[in-house]
Structure formats: C-alpha cells, structure tokens
Amino acid sequence: MKSGDHAAIDVPESSAVAKGKAPLIATPREQKSGFKKGLGIFDFLLRLGAIIAALAAAATMGTSDETLPFFTQFFQFEASYDDLPTFMFFVIAMALIGGYLVLSLPFSIVTIVRPHAVAPRLLLFILDIVALTLTTAAGAAAAAIVYLAHNGNPNTNWLAICQQFGDFCQEVSGAVVASFVTVVVLMSLVLLSGVALKKH
C-alpha cells in the first residue's frame, strides 16, 4: 500500500443506533388502529347522549300528570300517563333502553382500549339493533296517541284533549321527541359499529 492511498473501513451500525431510529411514516396497521380508536371514542360519546335522551324521555313521560282545577261531585278531571297502556309501555321501554346503554359503556371503553377486538363490537352491534327496534316501537306507539290527543278523530268520536290538558300534552310530546332523538343516536351507533366491523 502506498503512503498516499487511504483505506476505507466500513463500520457496522451499532444496534443501539439502529433502535434509536423511528420510521417517519406510520404503518397501515397503526393508521387503522388510530381510526378505530377514534370510532370507539365517538361511539362512547354517542352512548352518553343516548343515555341522556332515553332517561329524559322515560322521566318526562313517567311524571306527566295534570288535574283540572274544577270537578263535580262525582268526577275529578285528571290526565296521567298510567291511564293509557301505551304510555306505560313507553316508560318501561325507555327505562330499559337507558339501563342497557349504561351497561354498554364498559364494552364501548374496551373498543377504545383494544381497537382491533371484534367480539365487543359485534356484541354491541347486535344489542344496539335490538335496542333500536324497541325504541322505535315505543316512540311510534306513543306518537300515535299524542297525535290523537292533539287532533282527535271525528270518525270514531275521539275528542282532542290538549285544549283542556295543555301541560300534560306538552310533557308527553316532549317525551316522544326525546325518544326519537334516542332512535337517531342508536341508528348512528349501528352504522358506526358496521363501519368498524367492515374495517376488520
């Protein structure tokens, strides 16, 4: 070797240096995990909103009661939710839905902590469909009675009572609106679970 020549020596990169390097671009799996975690957080927030709407509907209907300030010797004019089986069914159904949604919160948290877990999402998907069906049935049945209370039905001689029982009708109408808010949120939850399961 001549004195003017320089020898190049390749030094292998140490494992410590190699471990210190992090990829600048996230892998597809990491991106999918972040997307599913975002869906899980949105699912949890929607459930909180549905709980508020369902319990508000049950409480409003369950406390709806109005007594007119005048009465006769034999009659006292009163309107209450328990006078109608449809409204009683509504209160029971919405209370059950509210209870289910509260119990579903831990499973929703699992989907946030473990975004790739299929079993909790599938369970919530099935139970949300059942809850959606029950809520829709209760809300639709109560809405029919509220419509008759506001407008009556001349063909069957059913008289409108909301001119006399204004506060009662306002409360039951608000309860029905809250139930349909719950329906919309449950529909969103079902669609959300479907998207999350499709991404698997």
From Swiss-Prot:
Intervals, Cytoplasmic compartment: 1-38, 108-121, 193-200
GO process annotations (BP): cell wall organization
Subcellular location: Cell membrane
Segments in the Extracellular topological domain: 60-86, 143-171
InterPro entries noted in UniProt: CASP/CASPL (IPR006459), CASP_dom (IPR006702), CASPL (IPR044173)
Any Gene Ontology CC annotation: plasma membrane
Main subcellular location: membrane
Pfam families: CASP_dom
Quaternary structure (record): Homodimer and heterodimers.
Protein name per Swiss-Prot or TrEMBL: Casparian strip membrane protein 1
Organism, scientific name: Theobroma cacao (Cacao)
